Design a protein with these regions (language model features):
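Residue-level preference for nonpolar/small residues embedded in alpha-helices
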Residues: 36, 97, 274, 319-320
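Phosphate/pyrophosphate-binding loops and the adjoining catalytic core of nucleotide-dependent enzymes
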Residues: 323
């Protein structure tokens, strides 16, 4: 009987991270059925280790090799669990590509995820980072996350509150060696409720001649904007936005706006703070379009670090550190990376 996983020793991870940097893993396990996870974790190759769980590789930077075995979940089933006239609860397994899930939901007549179209990566990775774009975060729609708890040796179901979602944050991000996300349950809407707070989204829809958009229209606009602004990882290595927008006290945001005319400021995650544009600060430090060897910053978007071909992860990390130092020097604000960094510290 064939095993529900595939095993590769001394595996290259170049094609498993969207930066396209070379890194190796002592073992790579590809798992087709999350039900076999407990048996897999009991294998001698994984005994006493904390395997690195790898989704689409779109939210990490290998600054060195993976010291522990790597586990890739390939389970990708999706189904509607329950529904009524206003909502539907959907269960998607961790290996389902995120954009494919968004498009599947639209085909089912379900709304809510359209602003998150074309985000790379897998569904299992989405709640870890609490992915967000164009005014929407996935945590708003999560009903529960199913995850293997390595500390307890059991499969757990964490409701939205237990996930502790924040800006690009969750309980899973703070305990990367504890949880392996196996599936996500989402509560989606039956009727369109367009979220058009992001100015560029409304402008894109207007340019498309759409005054009363449905969810598919919004997704089409988001896809057009992303394709125009963000380089395709299949063409040039990148992980999308590399830096988070810093959240600062209201008083500091107002002072920065007085000192730096044009600095975009957005609503924060609480009444007493604001989110300021990392892209604007990076661009005004002169980094947009910068290149040092094969490590660089996209000419189309200052938040995106790119691998022009043969940059190492460490070269990209060193560039990111230089960018952060220049922003701190000029604006007095610390910017932090979105991707998880493997093989080095930030």
């Amino acid at each position: 009987m064939s095993l529900p996983w595939r095993l590769t020793r001394d595996a290259s991870l170049r094609n498993r991270n969207t930066f396209g940097v070379e890194a190796r893993a002592p073992w790579l396990f590809e798992l087709d059925d999350a039900a076999a996870l407990a048996d897999l974790l009991a294998r001698p190759e994984l005994a006493g280790t904390s395997p690195l769980v790898l989704g689409g590789g779109s939210n990490l930077l290998f600054a060195g090799d993976a010291e522990s075995p790597v586990l890739a979940l390939a389970n990708a089933a999706t189904r509607v669990l329950a529904q009524d006239s206003t909502r539907a609860r959907v269960r998607a397994e961790a290996g389902m590509p995120w954009h494919a899930l968004v498009m599947w939901s639209l085909q089912q007549g379900l709304c809510g995820l359209e602003n998150l179209a074309l985000i790379p990566g897998t569904t299992g990775a989405a709640p870890i980072q609490n992915i967000g774009a164009y005014g929407v975060e996935v945590g708003e729609f999560v009903h529960a996350v199913e995850a293997w708890d390595r500390d307890e040796g059991v499969l757990r179901r964490l409701d939205r509150a237990a996930c502790a979602f924040g800006y690009r944050d969750s309980v899973f991000k703070h305990a990367p060696d504890r949880y392996i996300v196996t599936a996500v349950e989402l509560d989606l809407l039956r009727a369109p409720a367009p979220r058009l707070e992001y100015a560029g989204l409304g402008e894109e829809l207007a340019a498309m001649g759409i005054a009363d958009p449905d969810a598919s229209d919004v997704a089409e606009a988001v896809i057009a904007i992303r394709r125009r602004k963000l380089p395709d990882p299949a063409v040039i290595g990148n992980a999308g936005s590399f830096f988070k927008n810093p959240i600062v006290p209201v008083a500091l945001a107002e002072e920065l706006q007085r000192q730096h005319a044009g600095l975009p400021v957005f609503r924060g995650d609480a009444a007493d703070n604001r989110k300021i544009s990392a892209a604007w600060m990076i661009e005004n430090c002169g980094w947009k379009g910068y290149r040092d060897g094969d490590a660089g910053v996209a000419a189309s978007h200052a938040l995106v670090l790119v691998n022009h071909g043969n940059a190492s992860g460490m070269q990209l990390l060193m560039l990111a550190r230089r960018i952060a130092e220049s922003v701190a020097t000029r604006f007095g604000v610390a910017i932090e990376p979105e991707p998880r960094i493997i093989g080095a510290r930030w």
